[in-house]
Amino acid sequence: MPEYNIEMFPAITPKDNPFKIAEKKGIPIDLFKEGYSRIENCVSAFLSHHSLWEKCYEEKTEYQIFEHDAVCTNNIPKFIPYQGCISLGAPSYGRFETPMKIGVGPLSSKRYFPGAHAYRLKPVGAKTLLHRAKTDARPT
């Protein structure tokens, strides 16, 4: 099993005034208004991820990002071919898209990014996410 250097990152919380942070970064919060979560918590979680995207892009290094409650149930390979960002697992909610055939074929997932609980990110992917956050920020 590959070994990884794991570094805990201090999360942004509602005590940090996430609305002010989002405004300062030019991130709209309109799409965070939904019926399942408290908006302050959603914006805080998003900004925690956003901070790591900034670090990934600035440091020009690949990141693996795990939320505090992510559970690894299998080995994560060192090398995974991907473009900018790839989910490393399956969320505990929603339906999965089942491949139409067994064997080698394209990866299948959901129509949207299947959760932010565990993912790998390249600087080019971080740049894309940072750009999209200016217009399309929503709960992670």
Where are these regions (language model features)?
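An acidic/histidine-cluster motif and surrounding catalytic segment
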Residues: M1-F66, A70-T140
